[in-house]
């Protein structure tokens, strides 16, 4: 178990087909204690919808809550939610040495359709909450003398906005792109405290949201002919959390399977 004994807060664990679920499952299999977070009202608003069984089914599929798995429902649009989430994780399992920020607010607004309210909400969930999570994580890591133990890890997520335009999803593109840009800055802020910060761009990933037409169209731009899987994204995260990745910080890992955007 390569990640035996670690304690991770993983955000965005709300659907069994999602990347967050795959990350939580992988970390549990690798020996990590996982405090998982989700917010199903956002899924309810989206075309894919929330899982029928809700978060109870999600936690059951991960083995059920107990000594190594806990779950919290929190709206990260609320300014005090990130710190409260870290506090709850610490109260349950002690020092959190691993933070995986996987949650996101999706937003399909082009330039003509976007609104100030949607821009503010995407900023609050995707950027502000991420920064406040990292801030709270670093504070509790320092308070628990985490640097002396070594191995602090933060992993953020982006979606390739630094590689190509996304003009039909401007609020989402702006805020997820910001996380990719913040990775280097946060890595510099935390490297002296014994914490690495990296970002994962998982490429087109089959989480059940794409139509058959879109899946086929994008699939033609992927050398394998098929989209990446959530388990493959989780494997990249596990790699960045391991001891062998101790010297890797400030990087964005483009795990896109050779995605040829010019074909798509």
Task: Annotate each PLM feature.
Residues 12, 146-178, 183-192, 204:
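Catalytic loop of short-chain dehydrogenase/reductase
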Residues 139, 188-189, 246:
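Alpha-helical segment proximal to the catalytic Tyr-Lys
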Residues 1-93, 106-109:
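Short-chain dehydrogenase/reductase
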Residues 164, 216, 220, 224, ...:
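Short C-terminal tail/terminal secondary-structure segment
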Residues 105, 112-134, 155, 179, ...:
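Catalytic Tyr-X3-Lys loop
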Residues 222-233:
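A conserved structural motif in NAD(P)-dependent oxidoreductases
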Residues 48-54, 83, 104-120, 139, ...:
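Conserved mid-core segment of classical short-chain dehydrogenase/reductases
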Residues 191, 196, 248-250:
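Short, small/polar-rich loop/turn modules that mediate ligand/substrate recognition or access, typified
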């Amino acid at each position: 178990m390569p990640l035996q004994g670690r304690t991770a807060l993983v955000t965005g664990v709300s659907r069994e087909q999602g990347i967050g679920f795959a990350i939580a499952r992988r970390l549990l299999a690798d020996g990590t204690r996982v405090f998982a977070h989700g917010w199903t009202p956002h899924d309810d608003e989206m075309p894919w919808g929330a899982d029928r069984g809700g978060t109870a089914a999600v936690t059951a599929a991960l083995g059920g809550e107990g000594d190594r798995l806990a779950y919290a429902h929190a709206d990260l649009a609320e300014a005090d939610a990130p710190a409260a989430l870290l506090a709850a994780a610490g109260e349950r399992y002690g020092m959190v040495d691993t933070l995986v920020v996987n949650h996101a607010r999706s937003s399909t607004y082009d330039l003509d359709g976007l609104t100030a309210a949607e821009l503010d909400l995407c900023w609050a969930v995707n950027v502000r909450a991420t920064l406040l999570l990292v801030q709270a994580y670093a504070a509790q890591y320092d308070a628990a003398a985490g640097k002396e133990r070594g191995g602090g890890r933060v992993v953020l997520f982006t979606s390739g906005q630094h590689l190509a335009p996304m003009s039909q999803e401007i609020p989402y593109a702006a805020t997820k792109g910001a996380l990719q840009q913040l990775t280097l800055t946060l890595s510099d802020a935390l490297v002296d405290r014994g914490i690495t910060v990296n970002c994962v761009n998982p490429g087109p990933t089959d989480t059940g949201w794409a139509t058959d037409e879109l899946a086929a169209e994008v699939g033609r731009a992927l050398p394998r002919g098929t989209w990446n899987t959530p388990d493959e994204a989780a494997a990249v995260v596990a790699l960045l959390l391991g001891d062998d990745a101790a010297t890797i910080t400030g990087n964005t890992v483009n795990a896109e399977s050779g995605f040829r955007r010019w074909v798509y």
